């Protein structure tokens, strides 16, 4: 899936990610701080009903509870990090992590040459306090401040085939100044009235302010490279200028409260949960682009500069202006039951769950049934086989509601997928070290898709459920020490 189609959890808390960010170049630091991680579970599909409403995959992270004092410091050309952990008395544990990163040296290898100055800063804290033998209180906090400053200079690209190779060279003026700042905090109260019953209450808040500003002029020169037969090297094909302008600002506040529970039986367990989420998003878009070919601003198709076709209605320039504010509420709930059947030849695990969600903005209610069957044979090898299937509905977030011109559409529905996944987990020892091989084969039928295109690695949606598709593949991962 793309940047928006994957779930990320830390200690049962769903993590939100920037909305305007351009994937890979500007994301910088992911939320996950590897120094604080105790366990990782990843599923490329067919995940349980207890996980949320995304189409593609889920990454479930568990931050550890330290048993003693420790820490580490890392320094390098691409950044630095500091991590401290420990406990105070027998009830209170803490983890602190600070990270600073720059990928300017990596970005300097891109086709667009210039002065890249991205800086990403992140501070996280995870605290736990054992109130008594039955109760625990935990806090997870994060402060992130990401800046992406870029002054482009030149870009050179070659394309075509053996008989006609073309070279495009662009000289730039201007710069881009982006900033993404966010605050995240979550409290989790865990209560165990009995050994076979666990109850959790989770509340969290996420606030982000995102700014994308740029004024960039590019003067381009298109020529032949002379690699084909009989071509004149350096023959000019065309010159022109284009200007891109943006003043985009977005503010988002997301609050939620959630209850989860697990009842353990001799032959399985029962899990349930219910969640309420309130969102307020304010967005201001002011973008335009002008293309000037040889001194003339002529109407043209976006993908065929200088070619006019009266069948279409091309725009003289691309102008996106909007001022949107959305307040909405979401409700979701799930219940799932696991059965364990033991025989002489092995153990069977059956899991059946139902998840449902409702959003008051588009008035859509979507149920999502999910099921899985696993088998662990009684043999010397520690191996588990699993088949899973289910329906997954990704309710649109603000980004999916906004079309390429900045207009917001309230009739956009959830994107839906049907998963079929066959997987295996094999734990073994090699070179006197523990290893784990995880593999899966999957097929996903997709419908009510909201098409998007990549604009300089930024995902821009069409805000229409007018596509179908599929995803299929083989996923193999090897873990070792």
PLM region spans:
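Membrane-embedded beta-barrel scaffold of Gram-negative outer-membrane proteins
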Residues: 200-204, 414-472, 477-481
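Structural signature of Gram-negative outer-membrane beta-barrels, strongest in the C-terminal barrel
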Residues: 252-254, 267, 275, 319-445
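Flexible loop and strand-edge segments within Gram-negative outer membrane beta-barrel domains
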Residues: 136-137, 141-192, 207-232, 245-250
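Extracytoplasmic beta-strand/coil segments of soluble accessory domains associated
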Residues: 1-14
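Short acidic/polar hinge/loop motifs at secondary-structure boundaries
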Residues: 13-42
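Transmembrane beta-barrel wall of Gram-negative outer-membrane proteins
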Residues: 78-100, 113-151, 176-205, 265
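Outer-membrane beta-barrel transmembrane domain signature of Gram-negative proteins
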Residues: 231-235, 244-347, 466, 471-473, ...
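Transmembrane beta-strands of outer-membrane beta-barrel pores
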Residues: 46, 63, 77-79, 100-104, ...
């Amino acid at each position: 899936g793309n940047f928006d189609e994957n779930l990320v959890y830390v200690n049962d808390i769903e993590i939100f990610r920037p909305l305007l960010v351009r994937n890979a170049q500007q994301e910088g630091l992911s939320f996950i701080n590897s120094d604080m991680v105790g366990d990782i579970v990843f599923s490329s599909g067919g995940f349980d009903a207890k996980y949320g409403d995304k189409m593609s995959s889920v990454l479930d992270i568990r931050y550890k509870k330290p048993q003693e004092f420790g820490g580490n410091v890392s320094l390098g050309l691409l950044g630095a990090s500091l991590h401290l952990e420990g406990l105070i008395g027998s009830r209170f544990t803490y983890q602190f992590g600070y990270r600073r990163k720059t990928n300017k040296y990596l970005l300097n290898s891109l086709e667009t040459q210039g002065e890249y100055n991205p800086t990403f800063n992140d501070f996280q804290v995870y605290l736990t306090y054992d109130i008594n033998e039955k109760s625990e209180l935990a806090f997870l906090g994060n402060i992130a401040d990401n800046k992406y400053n870029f002054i482009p200079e030149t870009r050179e690209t070659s394309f075509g085939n053996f008989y006609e190779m073309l070279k495009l060279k662009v000289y730039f003026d201007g710069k881009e100044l982006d900033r993404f700042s966010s605050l995240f905090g979550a409290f989790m109260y865990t209560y165990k009235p009995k050994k076979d019953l666990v109850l959790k209450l989770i509340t969290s808040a996420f606030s982000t302010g995102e700014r994308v500003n740029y004024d960039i002029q590019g003067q381009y020169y298109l020529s032949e490279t002379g690699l084909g037969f009989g071509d004149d090297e350096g023959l000019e094909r065309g010159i022109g200028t284009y200007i891109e302008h943006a003043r985009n600002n977005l503010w988002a506040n997301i609050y939620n409260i959630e209850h989860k529970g697990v009842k353990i039986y001799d032959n399985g367990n029962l899990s349930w949960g219910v969640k309420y989420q309130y969102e307020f998003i304010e967005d201001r878009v002011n973008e335009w682009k002008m293309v000037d070919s040889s001194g003339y601003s002529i109407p043209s198709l976006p993908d065929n500069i200088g070619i006019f076709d009266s069948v279409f209605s091309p725009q003289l320039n691309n102008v996106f202006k909007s001022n949107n504010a959305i307040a909405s509420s979401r409700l979701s709930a799930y219940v799932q039951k696991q059965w364990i059947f033991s025989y002489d030849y092995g153990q069977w695990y059956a899991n059946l769950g139902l998840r449902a969600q409702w959003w008051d903005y588009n008035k859509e209610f979507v149920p999502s049934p999910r099921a899985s069957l696993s088998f662990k044979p009684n043999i010397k090898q520690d191996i588990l086989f699993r088949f899973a299937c289910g329906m997954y509905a990704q309710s649109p977030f603000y980004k999916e509601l906004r079309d390429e011109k900045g207009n917001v559409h309230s009739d956009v529905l959830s994107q839906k997928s049907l998963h079929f996944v066959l997987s295996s987990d094999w734990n073994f020892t090699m070179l006197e070290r523990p290893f784990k091989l995880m593999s899966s084969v999957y097929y996903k039928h997709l419908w009510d898709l909201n098409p998007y295109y990549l604009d300089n690695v930024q995902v821009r949606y069409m805000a229409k459920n007018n596509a179908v598709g599929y995803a299929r593949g083989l996923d193999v991962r090897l873990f070792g020490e």
